[in-house]
Amino acid sequence: MGGWSSKPRKGMGTNLSVPNPLGFFPDHQLDPAFGANSNNPDWDFNPVKDDWPAANQVGVGAFGPRLTPPHGGILGWSPQAQGILTTVSTIPPPASTNRQSGRQPTPISPPLRDSHPQAMQWNSTAFHQTLQDPRVRGLYLPAGGSSSGTVNPAPNIASHISSISARTGDPVTNMENITSGFLGPLLVLQAGFFLLTRILTIPQSLDSWWTSLNFLGGSPVCLGQNSQSPTSNHSPTSCPPICPGYRWMCLRRFIIFLFILLLCLIFLLVLLDYQGMLPVCPLIPGSTTTSTGPCKTCTTPAQGNSMFPSCCCTKPTDGNCTCIPIPSSWAFAKYLWEWASVRFSWLSLLVPFVQWFVGLSPTVWLSAIWMMWYWGPSLYSIVSPFIPLLPIFFCLWVYI
C-alpha cells in the first residue's frame, strides 16, 4: 500500500497514494476530467507519492511546516516543491558551447516581405487608392488642408494628440514657459532699476559740473555756511534744507531736468520723423505761404507709392507742390531751421558761416579732429552723465 502500481484499482480508497490531481482525496471521481479513471491508473506519472498518513507528519514543503501535500502541493512534485534543495553546479559551460571568440559576421537581414509584411500592403495600389477616399482623408487631414495628393501625416498626428488631450484633460504645463515667463519681467525690472539709479545721478553730475565752473582751481564749497544760518562744510550739490544754497541747488537741478526732458523730446521727434510718422513740409523762405497753405504736403510721393511721404515741397507751381526726394531726417532738420529762422531773423546771418565751414579743406577737418582728441578726456567728463540715456534711446529707436 502506498507504492506505485500499474494495475487497475477497484473501488474508492483502496490505494492511499491519492492518484488524483488535487492531491487530497484518494481515487477521487474528478479523475475523468483529467483523462483518468480507475481503469487507467497510469495517468499520474509521479513515481514519488506520499502516503496519506504522512500528510500529518511535520515536514517542510511548499506550504510550510506541518503540511506536506501528497503530490508536493500545487507547485508540483519537483524537488524544489517538496522542500528539497539541490546544489547547482556553478561551472560555466565550455567555450565551444558558449560562444566563439572574435567578431562574428552580421547575419543577413531577412527580406522585407518576411520581416514587415504590412509594408508590402502599404506599397500596394489598393492601399493608395483607399487613401484618396474622402472618408479616409478626413481622418488624417485637417479641415481646410491641402488638396494635393502628397500625404503629410506629421501635423495631423499632433492635432490628433491635441484633440485627445482636450478630451482627457489639460496637458502638463511646460516648466520652460513658466521659467521664461518669470525671468523676463525680472530681468526687465532689474535693468529698469539699474537705469533709474544711473539716470538719477545725471542731475547730480551735471550740478557738480555746473558748480565747478565757479570754483576753478579749487574744491567747490557751499558759501551758505558764512551766512546768518551757518552749517557744516558741505558741497554745493548736497545742501541741506536749512542752508541758503538749498534753493539755488533746487533751481539748478530743475533747469537740468528741463534740459534732459528737451533732449529726450528732440530725440523722440527725430525718431518719429525717421519712421515716417511726421509728414513735415518746411516753410517757403521769402514767401508768405504758411504751413496751412496749399503747399503743406506732397500729393504724390517722389519715391514710389510708399506709405509715408519721403519728399518735401520746394516751391509752389500753380498751387501744386514740386517734390524732391529728401530723407525724412533732413526734412525734419530743415523744418526746424526754417521754423527758427522765421521767428529769429538773426539766424539767417549764420548761413554764410555754416556754408563756409562745410566747404573747408580736409586739413581743417583733420585739425578739428586733433583738437577733439586733445580735449577728449575733459569732454568725456561732461558727456559721461548722458551715457545711461543711450540704452533708452536705443530701445526707443528699435521698438518704435
Swiss-Prot record:
Chief subcellular location equals virion
- Subcellular location, in the record's words? Virion membrane
Instruction: Spell out the post-translational modification annotation for this entry.
Output: Isoform M is N-terminally acetylated by host at a ratio of 90%, and N-glycosylated by host at the pre-S2 region. Myristoylated.
Which residue stretches are annotated as topological domain Intravirion?
A: 2-253, 203-253, 370-375
Residue spans of biased composition, Polar residues class: 89-106
Ordered alphabetically, the record's keywords are: Acetylation, Caveolin-mediated endocytosis of virus by host, Fusion of virus membrane with host endosomal membrane, Fusion of virus membrane with host membrane, Glycoprotein, Host-virus interaction, Lipoprotein, Membrane, Myristate, Transmembrane, Transmembrane helix, Viral attachment to host cell, Viral envelope protein, Viral penetration into host cytoplasm, Virion, Virus endocytosis by host, Virus entry into host cell
Task: Enumerate the InterPro entries for this protein.
Answer: HBV_HBSAG
How has the protein been applied in practice? Answer: Systematic vaccination of individuals at risk of exposure to the virus has been the main method of controlling the morbidity and mortality associated with hepatitis B. The first hepatitis B vaccine was manufactured by the purification and inactivation of HBsAg obtained from the plasma of chronic hepatitis B virus carriers. The vaccine is now produced by recombinant DNA techniques and expression of the S isoform in yeast cells. The pre-S region do not seem to induce strong enough antigenic response.
Region labeled Pre-S — which residues?
A: 2-174
Query: Which Pfam families does its entry note?
Result: vMSA (PF00695)
Coiled-coil features, chain-numbered ranges: none
Attached lipid, kind N-myristoyl glycine, located at G2
Any ranges marked Virion surface in the topology annotation, and which? 2-181, 275-348, 399-400
Glyco sites are at N320
Name the family: Belongs to the orthohepadnavirus major surface antigen family.
Swiss-Prot/TrEMBL domain comment: The large envelope protein is synthesized with the pre-S region at the cytosolic side of the endoplasmic reticulum and, hence will be within the virion after budding. Therefore the pre-S region is not N-glycosylated. Later a post-translational translocation of N-terminal pre-S and TM1 domains occur in about 50% of proteins at the virion surface. These molecules change their topology by an unknown mechanism, resulting in exposure of pre-S region at virion surface.
User: What is this protein identified as?
Assistant: Large envelope protein
**Organism (species):** Hepatitis B virus genotype A2 subtype adw2 (strain Rutter 1979)
What gene name is given for the protein in this entry? Answer: S
